From Swiss-Prot:
Domain free text: The SMC hinge domain, which separates the large intramolecular coiled coil regions, allows the heterodimerization with XCAP-C, forming a V-shaped heterodimer.
The protein, known as: Structural maintenance of chromosomes protein 2
Keyword GTP-binding belongs to the record: no
The family this protein is said to belong to: Belongs to the SMC family. SMC2 subfamily.
Biased composition (Low complexity): 1174-1185
Organism encoding this protein: Xenopus laevis
Self-association and partners: Forms a heterodimer with XCAP-C/SMC4. Component of the condensin complex, which contains the XCAP-E/SMC2 and XCAP-C/SMC4 heterodimer, and three non SMC subunits that probably regulate the complex: XCAP-H/BRRN1, XCAP-D2/CNAP1 and XCAP-G/CAPG.
Region (Disordered): 1174-1203
Protein encoded by which gene: smc2
Annotated SMART domains: SMC_hinge
Keywords attached to this entry: ATP-binding, Cell cycle, Cell division, Chromosome, Coiled coil, Cytoplasm, DNA condensation, Mitosis, Nucleotide-binding, Nucleus
Length: 1203
């Protein structure tokens, strides 16, 4: 198969339709100037063959292949090649029937890329398979040798050279297919894993589950059948029992009615006898009362009198105690309250007095200063009046004296300046001498000083790092000590908490979570544990108010409560308060205010206001405490409870309860502390425990955080201490060195120089000031009279100003003093009131003591009265015993009458029992009749099978089948049926069949895939072996031709392909070249032309091994000289007689050997092609073809491309 003609339209430089006809079946050459479009012909062939790497056709995308990228009005590129297919041996698969094959490829800008084979649309894969089947794989082309291919072959690595051999041997396609097959196997493997996962995770568990459900379903059916059998037996037995009960009840009813009549007769006889005995006893008692009745009455009257006296004294004692309690609690409380309020005022006044006193002190100091200023101004005025003048220090002196002092200052300054000048000069000379000496000994000191500075910097760096750690030295030890202390506290508090909890088992609400992921916040807890008492004195009252509700459980909703009751496994009975459903009522503010106005605001409170609780618990607390008032005393409670405006239940602090319905409860209470008081103690311990545990956790957390920091800090500190020691040693060494001493002397001299210079400067300033002052004084001396008048006037002004200021300060101070005195008086008054309150409280306490003494005296009187009552009771009892001694006959008759009454009572009980039984039998009889009727109505089979009930050898044989046991069995079976019925899957049988079918189907598909995989792997193994054999044969053949061709092109030389050292042919191949008898280590030892011949020889050897129908060479002779080029051309002509060559070359030696030569030109921006047929000697005929517009139009109808 070879190229016959090419049609190019809009492709690269071929703007117009260009037909290139008359290709020689063997050797064709293309030549032309650079840029004329000769390589574009080869690019068009590659484009048609389906090249994917567009860089090989010098383009970045398909749009670049269109003439001028579509900018010149041409929007598509089309290439059409006609192949000669007369040689059926080289025909592509499936095209043996065609003598010619025309393949067209077209790309449209912004459109799609399409192929046509013989005018029919085809996809890319089909075109690729067509060309690959004849060895024209353009994406791995051994038949295409483009510009630079020789260089590329020279740079190939061993695996790449092996790939060329594989391509020539035809095993490359197998490798590609093998890789594709392996990827397919991997995908199938993934599918197998997916199937296995589905089997393991879905189907198999489903089958197991359905099998279990099938067992449950079969068991359910079995139970249903047994229930049906036992139900009939049990219903038959109940029917028989009901009929027997109906008959038996009627008989027993008649017997009981007869018994009642007999018992009533006996009772009437007993009643008659009791009446007779009563008359006899009354006559005997009348006789007894006449004899001893007077003494008994007098004793009874004495007892009654003693009891009245006892009650009166006891009431007086109770009233005294109550008054004493009210007095102590109310009056003393008021005094203490007033005392505390005054104490607060006293504290505030003391602070105010302190503040004003501080202000007074400031004014006194200011006033004192103003007085001193006034005194000084007065003295100055007096001095000026006397002819004196003030100097700079404020001292009074004459002008002459001041002028003399200025002269002395000037003289003193001149002397000090001369001394400083001499000292400066000496120090400067000494400094120069010492500096020269120091320079000589500078080396060693400098080195030590540098070392000291380096250590100092290291030390500073360590200090910075330590500072960055933000760790305080000893912090870890503090935390460890704190942790030990907190651990002890936590253990102590936990023991105390557990001990207190053990004493209150009723306050523990334990339950099991009713469901998974249960939110414990839904259960708030017991009412007792949810409140806190504001005042401990109210604990008893609050406990009475709450009563049993103190142990109720508060939850968020009724659903939570239901779940707790059903599934919480509570150990005892609890009442539950759901916050969303509880109906709570609370006394209104108006009612509470009425009660407070009635007995005093501090004497009554709503129970709800005396407890603390969370806001979300408002409804529950109103339900428990919202409708009861708490009063301080019984009197106040009574007033509040029965007031018509209030009429509300009230409880006293002592626990006594008053109810508006008229009931009163109270009395002695347990001496043990209130539950709420102990509970408050428990809460305090719990709160403290939580706080300590939180603090301990924070300490633990901080210790964990500090762990790494402490370690790092210790390391840095150790390094810092070492550096500090090193720095101290170096500093000591520096200080002890002679250089250091000399340096100190130098510093001392420098300081002396600075001091001397400063002294010189100061003396000059002093001298200058003194001279200026002398001039001023001299001027004053000359104008003494005018100056004196001016100073006198100024002194008078200063005096007046100072006097005014002193008077004003004194006035302010006095006003402030008065204010302080007033406050001090108030303060003293308040202190006296505090003392008075204390005395009044002591007086109240003494009065309480007197009250207590009176109460003790009254208690003694009560005790005496009780003894008198007891004595009267004893005498009355004795008298009654005497009387009873006379009553034996009465007793006997009374005993007989009593027995008769007891007999009547017993008979009455029997009658009632019989009446009850009659009523019961009537009911049983009616129930049995109704039951029989209902059963006949409900179970239609009873009427037809009634005659079999209880008969032997039937399904209703009650002797063989115990009906009671059948009933128990039936009950158990029904429970089991209910349990199974909730979970049994009625569709289990069908679902199991479907699941098993799906399982079997998947297993079948899995086996098929595994078998296919096994066969593919076996085939790959066999083909790998054949591939290796074919590869060895190809290598040997190519190697032989490679050496032969290279020897021909370069006489005296030899070449071969050999595997790299230590590897096999299957790992790769590399070039081995010998010039003469010397084998070169690598190709770098050869010249450029020799290397090119090596690569070209290999390419030609490949072509000889498995000739492709077409070979394309693009300037492969570019790097060769003319002699080598001519040799190549002759070799192609003489040795390759079975393939078509299309060669692009610029050298005569190459294209003169071609049978047909195509020459390209670039005319008016468009490429054109001319054909020249050449003879054996290289001459050319004039039969050339040009692609012009006229020829294009003539052939367009015949060769137009389907667009």
């Amino acid at each position: 198969m070879h190229v016959k003609s090419i049609i190019i339209d809009g492709f690269k430089s071929y703007a117009q339709r260009t037909e290139i006809n008359g290709f020689d079946p063997l050797f064709n050459a293309i030549t032309g100037l650079n840029g004329s479009g000769k390589s574009n012909i080869l690019d068009s062939i590659c484009f048609l063959l389906g090249i994917s790497n567009l860089t090989q056709v010098r383009a970045s995308n398909l749009q670049d292949l269109v003439y001028k990228n579509g900018q010149a009005g041409i929007t598509k590129a089309t290439v059409s090649i006609t192949f000669d297919n007369y040689d059926k041996k080289q025909s592509p698969l499936g095209f043996e029937a065609h003598d010619e094959i025309t393949v067209t490829r077209q790309v449209v800008i912004g459109g799609r890329n399409k192929y046509l084979i013989n005018g029919v649309n085809a996809n890319n894969t089909r075109v690729q398979d067509l060309f690959c089947s004849v060895g024209l794989n353009v994406n791995n082309p051994h038949f295409l040798i483009m510009q630079g291919r020789i260089t590329k072959v020279l740079n190939m690595k061993p695996p790449e050279i092996l790939a060329m051999i594989e391509e020539a041997a035809g095993t490359r396609m197998y490798e590609c297919k093998k890789i594709a097959a392996q990827k397919t196997i991997e995908k199938k493997e993934a599918k197998l894993k997916e199937i296995q996962t589905i089997l393991e995770e879905e189907i198999t568990p489903t089958i197991h589950k359905l099998k279990e459900e099938r067992s449950s379903y079969l068991e359910y059916q079995k139970i249903m059948r047994e229930i049906e059998h036992l139900s009939r037996l049990y219903v038959a037995y109940q029917f028989v029992c009901a009929e027997e009960t109906k008959v038996r009840s009627a008989e027993e009813l008649k017997e009981m009615q007869d018994s009642i009549l007999k018992l009533q007769d006996t009772m009437a006889e007993n009643e008659r006898k009791v009446k007779e005995l009563g008359k006899e006893i009354a006559e005997l008692e009348k006789m007894r009362d006449q004899e001893v009745g007077g003494a008994l009455r007098s004793l009874e009257e004495a007892l009654s009198e003693a009891q009245r006296a006892d009650t009166k004294v006891q009431s007086a004692l109770d009233l005294k105690k109550q008054n004493m309690k009210a007095e102590r609690e109310k009056k003393r409380k008021e005094l203490v309250k007033s005392m505390e309020e005054d104490a607060k005022v006293l504290t505030a006044k003391e602070k105010e007095v302190k503040k004003i006193t501080d202000g007074l002190s400031s004014l006194q100091e200011a006033s004192q200063k103003d007085v001193e200023a006034f005194t000084s101004a007065q003295q100055h005025f007096n001095a000026v009046s006397a002819g004196l003048s003030s100097n700079e220090d404020g001292e009074e002196a004459t002008l002459a004296g001041q002028m003399m002092a200025c002269k002395n200052e000037t003289s003193k300054a001149e002397t000090e300046a001369k001394q400083a000048q001499m000292k400066l000069k000496h120090a400067q000379q000494e400094l120069k001498t010492k500096q020269a000496e120091v320079k000589k000994m500078d080396g060693g000191y400098k080195k030590d000083n540098e070392a000291f500075e380096a250590v100092k910097k290291s030390k500073e760096k360590l200090e910075v790092e330590m500072k960055k750690l933000n760790y305080e030295d000893g912090r870890e030890e503090q935390l460890l000590e704190k942790r030990r202390g907190l651990s002890r506290d936590v253990n102590r508090l936990r023991e105390a908490y557990e001990s207190l909890m053990a004493r209150f088992p009723n306050l523990q609400f334990e339950y099991k979570d009713p469901e998974k992921n249960w939110d414990s916040d839904r259960v708030k807890g017991l009412v007792a544990s949810l409140i806190s008492i504001k005042d401990v004195s109210t604990a008893t009252a609050l406990e009475v108010v709450a009563g049993g509700r103190l142990y109720n459980v508060v939850v968020d909703t009724e659903v939570t409560g239901k779940k707790l009751l059903e599934k919480g496994e509570l150990k005892r009975r609890f009442t539950i308060i759901p916050l969303n459903k509880i109906s709570a009522r609370c006394l209104g503010k108006d009612t509470v205010n009425v009660a407070k106005n009635l007995v005093g605001a501090d004497n009554v409170n709503l129970a709800l206001s005396l407890v603390g609780y969370e806001s979300e618990l408002q409804k529950a607390m109103e339900y428990v405490f919202g409708t009861t008032l708490v009063c301080d005393t019984m009197d106040n409670a009574k007033k509040v409870t029965f007031d018509k405006r209030i009429m509300t239940k009230t409880v006293t602090l002592g626990g006594d309860t008053f109810d508006p319905q008229g009931t009163l409860s109270g009395g002695a209470r347990s001496q043990n502390a209130s539950v709420l008081v102990r509970l408050q103690e428990l809460k305090d311990v719990q709160d403290e425990l939580k706080a300590k545990e939180t603090e301990l956790q924070e300490v633990e957390k901080e210790l964990m955080t500090l762990k790494n920091t402490v370690e790092r800090y210790r390391q840095l500190k150790q390094q810092w201490e070492m550096k500090s020691e090193e720095a101290e040693l170096l500093q000591t060494k520096l200080q002890q060195s002679s250089y250091h001493k000399q340096q100190e002397e130098l510093d001392s001299l420098k300081q002396t120089i600075e001091e001397s210079e400063e002294t010189l400067k100061n003396t000059k300033e002093v001298q200058k000031k003194a001279e200026e002052k002398f001039k001023v004084l001299e001027h004053k001396m000359k104008n003494a009279e005018a100056e004196r008048e001016r100073e006198l006037k100024e002194a008078q002004q200063k005096l007046d100003t100072a006097k005014k200021k002193a008077d004003a300060s004194n006035k302010k101070m006095k006003e402030k003093q008065q204010e302080v005195d007033a406050l001090v008086l108030e303060l003293e008054e308040l202190k006296r009131e505090q003392t008075t309150y204390k005395q009044q409280i002591e007086t109240v306490d003494e009065a309480m003591k007197a009250y207590q003494e009176q109460a003790d005296s009254m208690a003694s009187e009560v005790s005496k009265n009780k003894e008198a009552v007891k004595k009267a009771q004893d005498e009355l009892a004795k008298q009654k015993e005497i009387i009873m001694g006379h009553d034996k006959e009465i007793k006997t008759k009374s005993s007989e009458a009593g027995k008769l009454r007891e007999n009547n009572n017993d008979l009455q009980l029997k009658i009632k029992e019989l009446e009850h039984n009659i009523s019961k039998h009537k009911k049983d009889s009616a129930d049995a009749a109704a039951k029989v009727a209902k059963m006949l109505n409900d179970y239609e089979w009873i009427a037809s099978e009634k005659h079999l009930f209880g008969q032997a050898n039937t399904a209703y044989d009650f002797k063989t089948n115990n009906p009671k046991e059948a009933g128990q069995r039936l009950h158990k079976l029904q429970e089991k049926k209910e349990k199974l019925g909730r979970n049994v899957n009625m569709r289990a049988m069908n679902m199991l069949t479907q699941a098993e079918e799906r399982y079997n189907d998947l297993m079948k598909r899995k086996r098929i895939v595994e078998n296919d995989k096994s066969k593919i792997l076996t085939t790959i193994e066999e083909l790998d072996q054949k591939k290796n054999e074919a590869l060895n044969i190809a290598w040997q053949k190519v190697n032989k031709d490679f050496g032969s061709i290279f020897s021909t092109l370069l006489p005296g030389a030899n070449a071969m392909l050999a595997p790299p050292e230590g590897q096999s042919v299957l790992d790769g191949l590399e070039f081995k070249v010998a010039l003469g008898n010397t084998w070169k280590e690598n190709l770098t030892e050869l010249s450029g032309g020799q290397r090119s011949l090596v690569a070209l020889s290999l390419i030609l050897a490949m072509l000889l091994f498995k000739p492709a129908p077409i070979y394309i060479l693009d300037e492969v002779d570019a790097a060769l000289d003319l002699s080598h080029t001519q040799n190549i051309g002759q070799m192609l002509r003489t040795h390759f007689r079975h393939s078509q060559f299309i060669v692009v070359s610029l050298k005569d030696g190459m294209f003169n050997n071609a049978n047909v030569l195509f020459k390209t030109k670039f005319v008016d921006g468009v490429s054109t092609v001319a054909r020249f047929a050449q003879n054996q000697n290289g001459g050319s005929s004039a039969g050339q073809q040009r692609s012009d517009k006229s020829k294009t139009k003539e052939r367009r109808n015949r060769m137009e491309v389907d667009k």
